[in-house]
């Protein structure tokens, strides 16, 4: 397989942002008087925010709703209502020590990815922090992956994508990259097994069994 680089999704892969994201979606929905069921909002952890609010609020208000969400997520501290998953730090440290190029490829804006990695003291393991743009011009997973490839000069055939949702695995497939799905995040076994993957894992430490 000869992987030289690993691209990680953030939400549901490295950290569990459920509380902060759901609180921020709820904040925006309440502003527009849209009734929601909290459990049903979990499906929106992963895809681009504008797509979430097109479905929840309506296409005409989606971009405005993203700004309301960010009021709660950024200024309101929602990004730190978040937990790092077990074994993430030691696995990142081990993979870095083995010489892999480590990058994030998240649909969350890069500025927030950066702050969250710093908050959990894991930014030091990454060679490049890739995320979406605040203006929405880069938001879909394949566009983020393409940006990271361009910025780092890495060949797609040398990259393994790791993520918890179909958006991660499908984004990798569209960019002709291999992918591993993690089952401890927000995507079900059914969702991930329906996508092209080289493995589905229950713990991030299992990556070390896949990678030489």
Please name every model-derived segment.
Residues 40-41, 123-138:
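A short, structured active-site edge motif that brings together acidic residues
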Residues 5, 140-169:
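Conserved Lys-Pro-Asp/Glu-containing loop-to-beta segment of HAD-superfamily phosphomonoesterases
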Residues 161-199:
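Acidic, Mg2+-coordinating phosphoryl-transfer loop and its flanking beta/alpha structural elements
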Residues 35, 122-127, 155, 201:
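Conserved H-loop
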Residues 89-97, 149, 169-173:
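Surface-exposed amphipathic alpha-helices with a cationic face
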Residues 88-117:
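Substrate-recognition element of Asp-dependent hydrolases with the DxDx(T/V) motif
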Residues 2-90, 94, 98:
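N-terminal helical cap/lid subdomain that shapes the substrate entry/recognition surface
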């Amino acid at each position: 397989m000869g992987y030289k680089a690993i691209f990680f999704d953030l939400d549901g892969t490295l950290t569990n942002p459920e509380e902060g994201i759901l609180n921020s979606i709820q904040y925006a929905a309440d502003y527009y008087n849209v009734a929601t069921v909290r459990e049903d909002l979990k499906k929106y952890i992963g895809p681009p925010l504008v797509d979430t609010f097109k479905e929840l609020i309506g296409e005409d208000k989606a971009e405005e709703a993203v700004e309301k969400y960010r009021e709660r997520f950024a200024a309101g501290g929602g990004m730190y209502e978040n937990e790092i998953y077990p074994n993430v730090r030691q696995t990142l440290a081990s993979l870095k020590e083995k010489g892999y190029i480590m990058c994030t490829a998240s649909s969350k804006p890069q500025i927030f990815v950066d702050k969250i990695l710093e908050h959990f003291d894991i930014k030091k393991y990454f060679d490049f922090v890739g995320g979406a743009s605040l203006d929405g011009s880069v938001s879909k997973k394949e566009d983020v992956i393409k940006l990271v490839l361009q910025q780092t000069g890495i060949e797609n055939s040398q990259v393994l994508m790791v993520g918890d949702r179909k958006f991660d695995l499908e984004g990798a497939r569209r960019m002709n990259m291999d992918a591993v799905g993690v089952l401890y995040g927000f995507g079900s076994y059914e969702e991930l097994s329906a996508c092209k993957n080289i493995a589905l894992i229950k713990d991030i430490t299992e990556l070390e069994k896949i990678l030489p």
